[in-house]
Design a protein with these regions (language model features):
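Acidic/polar low-complexity segments and flexible, solvent-exposed patches
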Residues: 1-64
Length: 64
């Protein structure tokens, strides 16, 4: 199961978070925050992590 950990105002910021977490060895999914599911640059995005890795994300975010 995947849980939302952050929101991003656009795809560029979402990709930056994705790169950051994946650099820490944490698989991430990003999906547009839109019911139309349009994969455009300017729509807000949600950032998801698997439930099993949530504790790792919380620890990484604490260190920021």
């Amino acid at each position: 199961m995947w849980v939302q950990i952050k929101s991003a105002p656009n795809k560029v910021i979402a990709e930056m978070w994705k790169d950051f977490f994946e650099g820490e060895g944490i698989p991430i999914r990003i999906l547009p925050d839109s019911e139309k599911l349009e994969y455009k640059e300017r729509v807000p995005y949600k950032i998801y992590v698997s439930q099993e890795r949530l504790h790792v994300v919380e620890e990484v975010l604490r260190k920021l």
